[in-house]
Amino acid sequence: MRRAGGGSLIHMASVTGHLGHPGITVYGATKGALIALARGQAVELAADNIRVNTVSPGTVDSPMLHRFLADHATDIQKAREAFDRLHPRGKVGSIGEVAAVFVFLASDEAANITATDIRCDGGYGARGQQPTS
């Protein structure tokens, strides 16, 4: 990137890097550390015209969610509906919605965005304590 005159480095973090989730505390800690790493990299690399950001998705309709439900839910459809209800939009995100944030951050339109974490979580992180039913 230095030889090319700059660029955009985008790390995949997670909303769990901002929130406490029982049972996945180590995962959340690593994502929080990644957010901090990106901020430091952004400062270090700014003079080289390299922007560094993170994207923090919430729950996404993805193979990761499907594996989680298959491993932990007795009624997968009911569990999926419960995940949807955790989000103010009433549904989990899509892979395409998360990818669109990456495309934007890599674009010239995001030329002044660095050392920033963008949550793509459908409002999940804004709810505070999550409902269980």
Predicted features along the sequence, with ranges:
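Residue(s) in the substrate-gating loop at a strand-loop-helix junction
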Residues: 14
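Active-site helix of classical SDR
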Residues: 30, 38
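A glycine/serine/threonine-rich, flexible loop-to-helix segment
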Residues: 47, 59-86, 127-133
